[in-house]
């Protein structure tokens, strides 16, 4: 008798990568403007995301993408790209709930208390508490492993809770302690039911784990094309 095999369907869990790309190019060797160069590069990035990512077990290779960007046009001399990881989670409204947002990649934390005064390396889109929509709250971290909740008052971070959860920098895990979220602010100017959490990785090479799939966030990735000063001045 042959034992039957029951397939297990695993839901994909997407981690988005928000890139900040700067391209230096030689204006004397092309008829393209800076905007046209960045448009070409954006197509390269989109093609890379579609061909090399968006499936299981396909890592993001930072150096490979930079090589593709540099090869987009012969006038491009070099490029740099920062990487921020992002995940969405859907809060259970008006019910005390805790949440685990697992990036499965180590977070950047070069020393205890890193960047605490400016919000650490964790950020989020907005949400509401106590059914009050006149005050928007956000998450950040203190660089020592505490997740914080704050609002902006005259542009200054004002903290409601300095211990709203934990940040595990080594394992890339954000844990939100029991919280009653009553509403969600817009995400990218669009009405949303989800909150986006972002984190700066320790390495720009990102590896998916288990059911994790990587993709580039083409909406929030930014491009800056600049004429290389050396080629334009000869100095």
Residue ranges of each PLM-predicted region?
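Flexible glycine-/small-residue-rich
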Residues: 21-27, 103-105, 199-201
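Short, well-structured beta-strand/strand-turn elements
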Residues: 72-87
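A glycine-rich phosphate-binding loop feature that marks nucleotide/adenosyl-phosphate handling sites
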Residues: 10-18, 58-67, 84-91
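Carbohydrate-recognition loop of C-type lectin domains
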Residues: 1-52, 56
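Structural flexibility/helix-modulation signal
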Residues: 114-160
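Surface-exposed interaction regions enriched in Ser/Thr/Asp/Glu
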Residues: 143-145, 152-235
């Amino acid at each position: 008798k042959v034992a039957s095999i029951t397939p297990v369907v695993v839901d994909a869990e997407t981690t988005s990568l928000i890139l900040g790309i700067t391209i230096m190019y030689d204006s004397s060797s092309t008829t393209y403007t800076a905007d046209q160069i960045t448009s070409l590069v954006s197509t390269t990035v989109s093609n890379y995301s579609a061909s090399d990512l968006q499936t299981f077990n396909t890592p993001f290779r930072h150096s490979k993408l930079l090589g593709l960007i540099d090869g987009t046009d012969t006038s491009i001399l070099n490029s740099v790209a920062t990487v921020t990881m992002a995940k969405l989670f859907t809060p259970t409204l008006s019910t005390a709930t805790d949440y685990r947002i697992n990036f499965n990649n180590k977070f950047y934390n070069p020393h205890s208390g890193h960047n605490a005064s400016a919000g650490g390396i964790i950020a989020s889109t907005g949400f509401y508490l106590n059914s009050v929509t006149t005050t928007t709250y956000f998450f950040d971290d203190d660089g020592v492993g505490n997740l914080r909740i704050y609002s902006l008052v005259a542009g200054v971070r004002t903290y409601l809770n300095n211990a709203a959860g934990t940040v595990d920098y080594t394992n890339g895990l954000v844990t939100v302690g029991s919280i009653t979220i009553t509403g969600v602010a817009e995400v990218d100017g669009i009405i949303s039911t989800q909150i986006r959490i972002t984190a700066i990785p320790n390495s720009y090479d990102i590896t998916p784990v288990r059911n994790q799939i990587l993709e580039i966030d083409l909406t929030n990735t930014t491009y800056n094309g600049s004429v290389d000063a050396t080629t334009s001045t000869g100095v």
